[in-house]
Amino acid sequence: MLTLLSLPPAVALVSGFGLALVLAYIFTGLIGRLARRKGWLDQPSERRVHKVAVPRLGGVAIFLAFLISVLLIYWPGSLHEALVYEGFLPAAVFITAVMAYDDVRGLPPGIKLGLQTVAVVILMLPGLAAGHLNEHGDIISSIHNPLHIANIINSDTLEIPLIFAIPFTWFWTVGMMNTINFVDGLDGLAGGITMITAVVMTVISVLLGQYAVAVLCAIFAGSVLGFLPHNWTPAKIFMGDSGSMFLGLALAVLANIGGAKLATMLLLLGIPVLDVAVVIIQRVRGGRGAFHYDKRHLHHKLLESGYSQRQIVLMFYGLTSFFGLLAILSLVLPDALPFVFRTSIAGASLAHLIGLALVGLAMIFILSFLIRRRRPNKDQPVLTTSQPHRESNL
């Protein structure tokens, strides 16, 4: 277990969260002012919907707050967590730095995908180097078996051969980074969803007795929460790709470091993941690139239907919180939940997963109903967001 510099777990958790929150709030304000002086702004144009120039480097502030808090609060003690630590921090430094350059200068989508791949390679290197010790660090080499209770495969854990674990880790990590990137379409949306997810992961880690992982999740939650006041509509600063890519990378790692949380992460981010998957399929079927800019995402459609930014963001906050509560209650009161909600963090039956998928589809149906039910006021502009995607936002 991580040695938290002799701090009691509760003290480390609270102090880590508080330190990260304060640092992120201060750094975001400072970086916003620096970006304005240097002219590192997202300028309004016909292809954008915001009306004033806004800095896009908020992700750098989030990362710096996280990094400083992590270095001050804990140190890895076990081999697994040391390998994760050795891979995650360099990968986070790399992806934040290169995407900060993208926020300032701009990079084509192919280059950005290549840089994401480099970040994943950095993430996996310590685990690859220690493979002879049967310890793969950030490489996802096993998953909990959802078919165990159905007696399809009689094992709680499915071991993934390294030849498949490497591409699976790439797909999971790059997919998570781009999911958060695509969700970053309204002020406060990506940051708030990520913060709620991190808080839920903190609670679950505490319930599972994984206090070191809980501290890491709490620091991450505090870093994002400290940024949110600056990003709430109307935003004074955008997180940019430096922020969305770091947030996605961190979520991908946090789901793996504690073990048994990949399914939980998919539950919490089920709506954004389904939304991104559907939009990408529609783009590809329409002969466009997967990362071609359009307004097919749920938050775009809700915006065009007349809902305000705040209403839409709060809808997504509510959905994320709802699924987070289900995940927590499945540990605290598993027998009190309806059958389809009893999703064990240590492994769920196929029926449970199907039930949860149906719940997710029901949420999509509700959002679709809201889109059809309300129509925009003709006297008001339809698009009010100040955080647009770029045409090739990856």
What feature does the model see in each segment?
Residues 29-54, 278-310:
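Cytosolic, membrane-interface loops and tails of multi-pass inner-membrane proteins
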Residues 70-76, 324-338:
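Juxtamembrane "helix exit" motif at the C-terminal ends of alpha-helical transmembrane segments
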Residues 4-9, 341-349:
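Membrane-interface segments at the starts/ends of alpha-helical transmembrane spans
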Residues 298, 377-394:
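Short, highly charged, low-complexity non-transmembrane loops/tails of multi-pass membrane proteins
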Residues 30-34, 366-382:
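Membrane-interface capping segments at transmembrane-helix boundaries
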Residues 346-367:
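Small-residue-rich transmembrane alpha-helices that serve as helix-helix interface/gating elements
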Residues 2-276:
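"…together with the soluble PPM/PP2C metallo-phosphatase catalytic core" -> "…together
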Residues 306-331:
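Alpha-helical transmembrane segments of integral membrane proteins
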